[in-house]
């Protein structure tokens, strides 16, 4: 079955998206980093102008929910005063830059990112979901994250410019990397001219760079990411199912006594230099927590397309996963509709909300043919190991 048409764009601070609980606005801080003052200010804005709910995304961004047309303009102005949003919509649209979360000030990742920020005006108009990954640590950690153009290091330490989906990259120097990245973005813009404006790099029929080029080198494949818990830079944790409240987030920030925090592309946050942290309810710091194995969208009533309460179902399902050894190796996806926004890849078990119950799909996408339709949630929970 083919996938239903999903939104071809993501919300930004200037172009919020209407959802079931009002407008939602996305904030993409530079370097994926906020100061304590900025983070507390964001919580206050979410409480004052929205419904107090804050989403953490897989693109190292946060979303404020429940805005109205009147409160949106006030929220935007307040975010700009905190330097969390650009002064122009054109600049804000190009801030989709992911950084390897353990970057250090003035290291290669930092310098390349700063150079890109300085030259945003040189980029062409790009699809709304187009993004860049600065993944230049010793080992890539962002290969499982969404990005169209990547800078990575090879096993022998070369800096490579890589198109998403390619198994090779072009060798570039630190001085030429950003110029080459901008040139590749222009090549992409030319390649999709007259076609689908929402095309992504991985959808092109063939790479724009040649694998036969004398400067082409095999990329270093990696399944690494940043584990939850204590790290060299602080403490990495995640809100359950990617969402928290402004009040809970504020309490966490004050208790952590951190000066800065980083947003990670696993719907998490890295509290810099936090120590002796008591994890509050609603946040996860254990990689074995079964809630991490459930990918779930906001669901109803937050999403207008959703037909069921996905997060409530996920909260009931998580303890069953943890208590059943037969499910230890399975990943699950709960989707409010057949678009499968939370996880567009195949999953061991997918449950798609319908007006009555959930459809069950085994080793497929949310839009694939189900083996059972409209099953009662209680029956699903009683028979999780039987699918």
Question: Over which residues does each language-model region extend?
Answer:
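Rieske [2Fe-2S] iron-sulfur domain-containing proteins
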Residues: 182-185, 189-193, 214-255, 259
């Amino acid at each position: 079955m083919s996938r239903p048409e999903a939104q071809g764009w993501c919300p930004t601070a200037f172009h919020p998206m209407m959802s079931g609980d009002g407008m939602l606005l996305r904030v993409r801080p530079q370097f994926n980093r906020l100061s304590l003052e900025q983070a507390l200010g964001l919580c206050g804005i979410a409480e004052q102008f929205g419904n107090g709910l804050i989403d953490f995304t897989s693109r190292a961004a946060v979303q404020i929910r429940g805005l109205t047309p009147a409160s949106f303009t006030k929220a935007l102005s307040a975010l700009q005063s905190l330097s969390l949003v650009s002064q122009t919509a054109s600049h804000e649209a190009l801030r989709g830059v992911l950084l390897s979360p353990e970057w250090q000030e003035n290291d290669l990742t930092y310098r390349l990112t700063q150079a890109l920020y300085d030259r945003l005006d040189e980029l062409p108009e790009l699809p709304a979901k187009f993004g860049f990954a600065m993944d230049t640590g010793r080992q890539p950690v962002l290969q499982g994250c969404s990005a169209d153009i990547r800078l990575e290091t090879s096993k022998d330490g070369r800096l490579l410019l890589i198109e998403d989906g390619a198994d090779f990259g072009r060798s570039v120097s630190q001085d030429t990397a950003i110029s080459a990245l901008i040139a590749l973005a222009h090549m992409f813009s030319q390649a999709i001219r007259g076609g689908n404006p929402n095309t992504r790099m991985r959808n092109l029929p063939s790479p724009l760079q040649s694998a036969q080029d004398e400067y082409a080198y095999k990329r270093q494949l990696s399944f690494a990411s940043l584990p939850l818990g204590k790290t060299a830079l602080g403490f990495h944790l995640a809100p359950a199912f990617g969402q928290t409240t402004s009040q809970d987030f504020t309490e966490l920030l004050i208790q952590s006594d951190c000066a800065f925090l980083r947003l990670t592309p696993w719907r998490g946050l890295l509290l810099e230099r936090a120590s002796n942290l008591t994890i509050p309810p609603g946040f996860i710091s254990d990689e074995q927590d079964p809630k991490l194995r459930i990918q779930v969208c906001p669901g109803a009533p937050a999403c207008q397309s959703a037909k069921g309460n996905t997060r409530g179902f996920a909260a009931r399902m998580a303890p069953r996963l943890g208590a059943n050894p037969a499910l230890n190796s399975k990943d699950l996806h709960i989707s409010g509709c057949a678009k499968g926004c939370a996880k567009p890849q195949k999953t061991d078990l997918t449950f798609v909300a319908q007006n009555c119950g959930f459809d069950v799909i085994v080793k497929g996408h949310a839009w694939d043919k189900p083996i059972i339709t409209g099953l009662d949630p209680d029956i699903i929970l009683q028979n999780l190991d039987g699918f």
